[in-house]
Regions:
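Short clusters of hydrophobic/aromatic residues that line enzyme substrate/ligand-binding pockets
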Residues: 2, 59, 111
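Basic, Lys/Arg- and aromatic-enriched nucleic-acid-binding interface segment
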Residues: 2-48, 52
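Exposed loop/turn and edge beta-strand positions of beta-sandwich/beta-sheet ligand-binding modules
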Residues: 11, 34, 69-71, 84, ...
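Residue-level detector of conserved, well-ordered beta-strand and adjacent loop positions
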Residues: 14, 18, 26, 74-76, ...
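Helix-turn-helix-type domain boundary/helix-start signal
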Residues: 15, 27-28, 84, 88, ...
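Conserved tyrosine-mediated DNA breakage-rejoining catalytic core shared by Y-recombinases
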Residues: 19-20, 44, 53-98
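Short, basic (Lys/Arg/His-rich) helix/loop patches that form interaction surfaces
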Residues: 27, 32, 44, 104-108, ...
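C-terminal catalytic core of Y-nucleophile DNA break-rejoin enzymes
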Residues: 79-99, 108-130
Length: 162
């Protein structure tokens, strides 16, 4: 449970997912698909729709000069009018998650249900809401699933990665 009171803490009044909330949710007993979705959204800043439509072909893996794995997500953003190209360098945690999903999922989609179809956003919203029920059991505080993406900026600033 997060120790701050969101009614008093102005940082939590923001619409983004805070780093503290992110870290607390990561430790919860929730489905791996949801936790992977959370990690990728928070670490990359991708929109939920873009994560749900990620395909194996969008993840570009290679080795650097030292033999270490590196990777990028490449594709086109779905929710932009100009069809903005996506080219996001992956940190080691995101890279590990996506490599694991690429090796263990038969579907071309990296976030697919048992039928091989991409999950719906409703699936992830359900667990995001459940996470907030656990974080703030005495309060009716819930954030939009889009708060995951919004928290990315603060996460990057916190670790001097922006």
């Amino acid at each position: 449970m997060v120790k701050t009171n969101p009614k008093v803490d102005t940082e939590n009044e923001k619409s983004y997912l805070t780093v503290e909330e992110f870290n607390a949710i990561r430790k919860m007993d929730l489905p791996k698909d949801f936790l992977d979705f959370l990690e990728i959204g928070f670490r990359t800043g991708l929109r939920a729709a873009d994560i749900l439509n990620l395909k194996k072909e969008n993840v570009k893996l290679k080795k650097d000069d030292n033999g270490n794995s590196t990777g990028h997500i490449q594709g086109t953003a779905l929710k932009t009018k100009s069809q903005t190209p996506i080219n996001i360098r992956l940190d080691q945690k995101s890279l590990s998650i996506l490599k694991d999903r690429m090796g263990n999922i038969k579907s071309e989609f990296l976030f697919a249900n048992r039928s091989g179809n991409p999950y719906t956003i409703e699936y992830f919203k359900k667990y995001f809401r459940k996470a907030f029920d656990q974080l703030y059991p005495d309060m009716a505080l819930h954030k939009s699933i889009h708060a995951i993406r919004s928290g990315n900026r603060k996460f990057l600033e916190m670790y001097n990665l922006n």
